[in-house]
Amino acid sequence: MKKKQFLKESDVTAESVFFMKRRQVLKALGISAAALSLPHAAHADLLSWFKGNDRPPAPAGKPLEFSKPAAWQNNLPLTPVDKVSGYNNFYEFGLDKADPAANAGSLKTDPWTLKISGEVAKPLTLDHDDLTRRFPLEERIYRMRCVEAWSMVVPWIGFPLHKLLALAEPTSNAKYVAFETIYAPEQMPGQQDRFIGGGLKYPYVEGLRLDEAMHPLTLMTVGVYGKALPPQNGAPVRLIVPWKYGFKGIKSIVSIKLTRERPPTTWNLAAPDEYGFYANVNPHVDHPRWSQATERFIGSGGILDVQRQPTLLFNGYADQVASLYRGLDLRENF
């Protein structure tokens, strides 16, 4: 089935409009001082567009060897590498979208240890080299949808999580998978200072049901645009679950633990009425403070680059994953 494309050449904003003075742009968008008083996550991405014309460098990671299976290639317009590497949420390095690229160079990613434990027959420990050599790597072009109602299309490189979990041999007691980011406050300013880190409790933790973790789409990601992940994108290994909001994509993972009970997750702990455990992309279930019916695609230009496009149920992966939630109330279990 041919996939719907929502971006047209006419959607791209003229260069003369993009380079309007900041005050003119704010006025044109109807953004008032009151709007800017909203909680940071609701508007920090918007303000990041007005930081000037400087662009962070492209990822400087080493080139990776990987295949490009036809099943994971498509004709979706890719988000440019400078946006993928320079427009990020990684609160351990600051709240502004440009902060991770500016501050994440302090993160030491080699050596690295990733432990797989819990309800498994064969606990595992992987080192830095294992992450790129133990499993065949493949490039997958995935949509990425942030809960803040913006989106990207990214050529991630990695291996299916189910291959790693299969080596550990989950026991019959395993129902969930818990993930944990490195805790290194000496390297991560947001873990040192609650103001810098958005008031979250660290280390960052996430979780999936076991069947979600075993789904072929769920990717342990070690690279982007042909190279190893840069620190601001979650080096050396992060999770990508393309049918869920981006905050489920935990970065810089040091622990994977299979559990009997549903594990706590950082954003659900911080604001349970706003961020659910499932976090499936759903245009029919709004965030309490903004609509999820549409999204802004982050393309090659600035804030006025494209028109909004419709949000797709499960981020366009409904055919592959909807059966996981048969009989589940998606409004209640958001």
From Swiss-Prot:
GO terms of biological process kind: protein repair
Reactions mediated catalytically: L-methionyl-[protein] + a quinone + H2O = L-methionyl-(S)-S-oxide-[protein] + a quinol; L-methionyl-[protein] + a quinone + H2O = L-methionyl-(R)-S-oxide-[protein] + a quinol
Signal sequence range: 1-44
Highest taxon above the source species: Bacteria
Entries under InterPro entries matching the protein: MsrP, OxRdtase_Mopterin-bd_dom, OxRdtase_Mopterin-bd_sf, TAT_signal
Cofactor(s) required for function per UniProt: Mo-molybdopterin
EC number: 1.8.5.-
Gene3D superfamilies registered for this protein in UniProt: Oxidoreductase, molybdopterin-binding domain
Gene Ontology CC: periplasmic space
S-S pairs: none
Keyword hit for Repeat: no
This protein's record includes keyword Metal-binding: yes
PTM info: Predicted to be exported by the Tat system. The position of the signal peptide cleavage has not been experimentally proven.
Annotated residues for binding of Mo-molybdopterin: N88, Y91, E92, C146, T181, N233, R238, G249, I250, K251
Compartment(s) where it occurs, according to its Swiss-Prot or TrEMBL record: Periplasm
Manner of cofactor binding, per the entry note: Binds 1 Mo-molybdopterin (Mo-MPT) cofactor per subunit.
TM segment ranges: none
GO MF, one example: metal ion binding
Alphabetized PANTHER family for the sequence: PROTEIN-METHIONINE-SULFOXIDE REDUCTASE, PROTEIN-METHIONINE-SULFOXIDE REDUCTASE CATALYTIC SUBUNIT MSRP
Family: Belongs to the MsrP family.
Function: Part of the MsrPQ system that repairs oxidized periplasmic proteins containing methionine sulfoxide residues (Met-O), using respiratory chain electrons. Thus protects these proteins from oxidative-stress damage caused by reactive species of oxygen and chlorine generated by the host defense mechanisms. MsrPQ is essential for the maintenance of envelope integrity under bleach stress, rescuing a wide series of structurally unrelated periplasmic proteins from methionine oxidation, including the primary periplasmic chaperone SurA and the lipoprotein Pal.
Complex and partners: Heterodimer of a catalytic subunit (MsrP) and a heme-binding subunit (MsrQ).
Protein name, per record: Protein-methionine-sulfoxide reductase catalytic subunit MsrP
Biological source species: Escherichia coli O139:H28 (strain E24377A / ETEC)
